[in-house]
Amino acid sequence: MEEIVVHGGQRLTGNVHIEGAKNAVLPILAASLLASSGQTHLSNVPVLSDVFTMNNVLKFLNTKIDFDEINKTIDIDASRQLSSEAPFQYVSKMRASIVVMGPLLARLGHAKVAMPGGCAIGSRPIDLHLKGLNALGAEIERHDGYVEATANQLHGAAIYLDFPSVGATQNIMMAATLADGITTMENVAREPEIVDLANYLNQMGAKVTGAGTETIRIEGVKAMHGCDHSIVQDRIEAGTFMVAAAVTQGNVLVEDAIAEHNKPLISKMREMGVTVTEEPAGIRVIGPEILKPTSVKTMPHPGFPTDMQPQMTILQLCAQGTSLLTETVFENRFMHLDELRRMNADFKVEGRSVIMYGPTDFNGAQVTATDLRAAAALVIAGLVSRGYTEVTNLKYLDRGYFNFHGKLAKLGAEIKRVDVPDGTVYALNPDFANEAAE
C-alpha cells in the first residue's frame, strides 16, 4: 500500500511549477474524436491517471494515440473508422468519460456509453447532458448500465440548462459543432476550461462564440480537422499550492498561475490576511503569522470553486476565530472533515454548511482520502500538524496531481511517498527531506 507521510512544521518557500489543467485536457481529448481528417497535437498535457484512462477510452474507440510523458504531449489520429461504444471497464473509472458521447453522436450518429464513475461526491446525474442531446435531435435510451444515443442528423436548437453544469455544457457544445444549423445554449458553465475547449474546437474548424459568458452560440459545420493546441494551466492545482503556502506561513511563487482564473480564492485569502501578488512569472503567496476567519460559499464559476473547498477548510481551520463554509454545488462534499476530526479539527456540520472553530492545533494521524481534492487537503493538513501524518488511498490524488509530494518537498516540506505493509507506522529518518526532493 502506498501512502504519503508528512512531518509537519516546515515553512514552504521557493517556486512551484503548475501543470496543464486536468479539467481542460479531458474534454479536449474527447473533442479530438470530431476530427475526421488531420492529426491533433496537444502540449502542456498533465501526466495523470485520469489522462491515461481517457487515452484508453479513445484507443478502444480506435483512435491512434501517442502520449509522450516526458515532453507532456499527446498526438492523436482520429481520422480512422471509429467505434461508437465506450465500455464499462474504462468509463466506470472516471466521470469525465461521459463527454465522449457528444462527439461520437455528432460524428457517427450513434453513441453507446457506460454510466460514468469517478469520485463519490454527490449524485451528479447526467440528465442535463441527455436533455441537451435530445434537444439536438438525438433519441436517448438507458439500459443495462449504458446510455445509448442515436441521430441521423443533429440539428441546431435553443437549449437552456437548468444548472450551469460543466460536463453538460461541454457535451452539448461538442455535439452541436457538427449539427445542422445554429445552437444557442443559455445558463451554461463559464469556467476557464470551457473557454479552452471552445478555443480548441474553433482551431479544429468549429464556429463557437460566447464561451466564458452565460450564452454560447454554435454554428454547425460540415467537418472538422486536427490541430495543435496547448492546454491551459490548472487553476485548481495553482490554488492548492497557494493554500499550502499560506497555511505554512510560506513564501511561494506559483509559476504560470493565472490570477484571473482564481479571483474568488485570491479575494478570500487576502481577506484572511494572506499577501497575494501578481508577478510576471505567476502569483506569489506569503502567509501571515495569524490568519483571520472568513465565510466562503461555493458557487459555479465565477464564484468560489467547489474543487477548492476541501483545501480551503484547512486554511479556515487554522484561522484565529470562527469560520463558515457553505457548499452549494455538491450535496456530499464534507467527507474529508471526519478525517480532519481525527487530526484534532473542531467543527460542526449543519446541512450544507460547516462551522469551523480555530485556530486548530493539528495532530498527525493516519487518514484516508475519500476523493481527489480531499486527498490534497489532508496532505496540506499534515504540513501544519505536530508529528507525522500518513495519507492513504492515493489513487484519488493521482487522478488530479502530478508529483504532488515531490513538488512540496522541493518547497521545503518533510514529505515522502512510501510503499509500506498494511498497519505499519512509517518513521522518518533525518535525511527524509533530502530523499523526498530527489
UniProtKB/Swiss-Prot annotation:
Q: Which residues bind phosphoenolpyruvate?
A: K22, N23
Primary location class: cytoplasm
Task: Spell out the reaction equation it catalyses.
Answer: phosphoenolpyruvate + UDP-N-acetyl-alpha-D-glucosamine = UDP-N-acetyl-3-O-(1-carboxyvinyl)-alpha-D-glucosamine + phosphate
According to its record, what are the GO cellular component terms? cytoplasm
Q: Where is the active site?
A: C119 (proton donor)
According to its UniProt record, in which pathway does this protein act? Answer: Cell wall biogenesis; peptidoglycan biosynthesis
Task: Report if keyword Amino-acid biosynthesis is assigned.
Answer: no
Q: Where in the cell is it found?
A: Cytoplasm
In terms of domain of life, where is this protein from? Bacteria
Give the UniProt keywords, A-Z.
Cell cycle, Cell division, Cell shape, Cell wall biogenesis/degradation, Cytoplasm, Peptidoglycan synthesis, Pyruvate, Transferase
- Keyword Cell cycle assigned: yes
Residues the entry annotates as binding UDP-N-acetyl-alpha-D-glucosamine: R95, R124, P125, I126, D127, L128, D307, V329
Task: State the Gene Ontology terms under molecular function.
Answer: UDP-N-acetylglucosamine 1-carboxyvinyltransferase activity
Instruction: Tell me which residues bear 2-(S-cysteinyl)pyruvic acid O-phosphothioketal.
Output: C119
Instruction: Report the record's Gene Ontology biological process terms.
Output: cell division; cell wall organization; peptidoglycan biosynthetic process; regulation of cell shape; UDP-N-acetylgalactosamine biosynthetic process
Which EC number applies? 2.5.1.7
The entry's function note states: Cell wall formation. Adds enolpyruvyl to UDP-N-acetylglucosamine.
Q: Please report which protein family the annotation says this sequence is part of.
A: Belongs to the EPSP synthase family. MurA subfamily.
PANTHER family listed in its UniProt record = UDP-N-ACETYLGLUCOSAMINE 1-CARBOXYVINYLTRANSFERASE
Can you name this protein?
UDP-N-acetylglucosamine 1-carboxyvinyltransferase 1
Q: What is the scientific name of the source organism?
A: Lactiplantibacillus plantarum (strain ATCC BAA-793 / NCIMB 8826 / WCFS1)
